[in-house]
C-alpha cells in the first residue's frame, strides 16, 4: 500500500495547483479566458502575456509568451508555452512544448510523444504517463498511484507510487517508493479514479529490458523485486524497506 506520507505529498501538490488556479486571477497584468463549455486558443493565436484559462474543456493550440495557468475537466495543450505551465483538472494532456517547469495535479496526465518540458515536472494525482518520445529535460517529482515512463527524464526521477514502470530513459538517479505487487486493489487513490482515467496497472516496480538509467536506482518497498528489474542501472541498485511508522 502507498505510504501515507507520500499520499499526503500528492494531496499537497494537488491542493497547491488548485489554489494557484483558483486565486491567480486576482493578479494584475494577466489575460483571463473562461466559459462553461469549451475554450480554445487557436493555432494561429499568440498571447504576449501570462494567461489564465478556466472551463470545462480547454484546448490550447496557440503560443503563450508567458506562463499558462489552466484548470478544467479536460485540458489539452498542443501549442507552445514560453514560460511555465500550471495545470489542474481531471484528464490532462500535454502534447506541445513548455519552456519552463510544469506543475500539475489531476486524475491523469499524459505527456505525448512530441511533448517537451524545458525544466522540471511536478505531478500529484492518480496516473502519469510519459509516452515514448516525450522529454523532461531536468528532474521529475511524482507522487501518485502509477507512473509509466516511456520517454526521457534528463536528470533525476523522484517517485512515490503504488506502481512504477520504466521503459524509457533516466539520465541520472531514480529514487522511488513503490508498492508491494501483492497489494492489488489496496490503494488510497481509489477515490480519485474517474471516467477518462487510464486503467490501473499492477502495483510494484518494473524496469523494462530497453530502459536506461544512467545513475543509481534506489527503491523502497515492503518486498524486494529483483526479477522486475530487467535493465542494469549505470550506478547499481539499492533496495531498502520502509522505516517503521511510515506506512
Regions found by a protein language model. Give the residues of each.
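Bacterial N-terminal signal peptides that target proteins for export
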Residues: 2-13
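Soluble extramembrane regions of membrane proteins in the secretory/endomembrane system
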Residues: 27-247
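C-terminal segment of classical bacterial N-terminal signal peptides
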Residues: 17-27
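Residue-level detector of solvent-exposed, low-hydrophobicity positions
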Residues: 14-16, 246
Amino acid at each position: 500500500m502507498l505510504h501515507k506520507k507520500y499520499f499526503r505529498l500528492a494531496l499537497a501538490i494537488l491542493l497547491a495547483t488548485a489554489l494557484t488556479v483558483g486565486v491567480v486571477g486576482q493578479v494584475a497584468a494577466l489575460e483571463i479566458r473562461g466559459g462553461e463549455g469549451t475554450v480554445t486558443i487557436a493555432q494561429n493565436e499568440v498571447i504576449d502575456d501570462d494567461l489564465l484559462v478556466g472551463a470545462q474543456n480547454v484546448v490550447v493550440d496557440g503560443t503563450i509568451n508567458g506562463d499558462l495557468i489552466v484548470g478544467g475537466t479536460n485540458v489539452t495543450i498542443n501549442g507552445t508555452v514560453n514560460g511555465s505551465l500550471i495545470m489542474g483538472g481531471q484528464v490532462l494532456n500535454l502534447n506541445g512544448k513548455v519552456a519552463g517547469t510544469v506543475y500539475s495535479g489531476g486524475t491523469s496526465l499524459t505527456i505525448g510523444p512530441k511533448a517537451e518540458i524545458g525544466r522540471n515536472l511536478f505531478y500529484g494525482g492518480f496516473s502519469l504517463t510519459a509516452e515514448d518520445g516525450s522529454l523532461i529535460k531536468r528532474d521529475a517529482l511524482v507522487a501518485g498511484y502509477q507512473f509509466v515512463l516511456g520517454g526521457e527524464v534528463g536528470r533525476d526521477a523522484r517517485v512515490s507510487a503504488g506502481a512504477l514502470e520504466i521503459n524509457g530513459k533516466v539520465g541520472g538517479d531514480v529514487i522511488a517508493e513503490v508498492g508491494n505487487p501483492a497489494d492489488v486493489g489496496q490503494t488510497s487513490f481509489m477515490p480519485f479514479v474517474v471516467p477518462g482515467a487510464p486503467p490501473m496497472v499492477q502495483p510494484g516496480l518494473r524496469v523494462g529490458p530497453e530502459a536506461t538509467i544512467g545513475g543509481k536506482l534506489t527503491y523502497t518497498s515492503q518486498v524486494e523485486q529483483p526479477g522486475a528489474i530487467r535493465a542494469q542501472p549505470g550506478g547499481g541498485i539499492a533496495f531498502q524497506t520502509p522505516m517503521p511508522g511510515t506506512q
